[in-house]
Amino acid sequence: MQDIIRKTRNRVWSRSYRAPHMYNDSTEEVASVFDEPTKSLIYSRFANPTVMAVEDKIAELEGGVGAMCTTSGQAATLLSILNICKAGDSFISTTEIYGGTVNLFSFTLKKLGIECIFVDANASDEEIDKAFQPNTKAVFGETIANPALTVLDISRFADIA
């Protein structure tokens, strides 16, 4: 994929690609995308040079090996939990989160067999510790929380975990 992006980057700034469809040299090249998705670009919903440039820059700035951009915070939240938890797992979330996320955690993930245990961010250390189960895989919180604008004490939760 880097070669594809590199072809578009011989300028001071990255070009913005607004077209949903990408040009390919042959139908064989297009067909190969479905066998090996990193080989070529076909349609911007799968990948496009603009998003890939942003992902590369974020990874570089953060010192990471990669990054993933999503079209919404809900998509990012869902993907983060699904990459850590599977059916039968649980995770802890503070109650001070966006209402749509409460719905995602309480209903959607429950249908997939993933349990969310909600705790108040201001609960005692003992109450938070008690929420952890043997199958707890993650802790989720927002900072600055929506809509309360509270700041989560991440280090406190990390110490308890």
Kindly label every feature range from the protein language model.
Residues 86, 132-139:
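Short acidic/histidine-rich motifs immediately flanking catalytic phosphotransfer sites
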Residues 145-161:
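Active-site core of PLP-dependent enzymes with the aminotransferase class I/II
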Residues 25-78, 100-109:
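Conserved N-terminal alpha-helix of the aminotransferase class I/II PLP-enzyme fold
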Residues 83-101, 120:
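Conserved PLP-anchoring active-site segment centered on the Schiff-base-forming lysine
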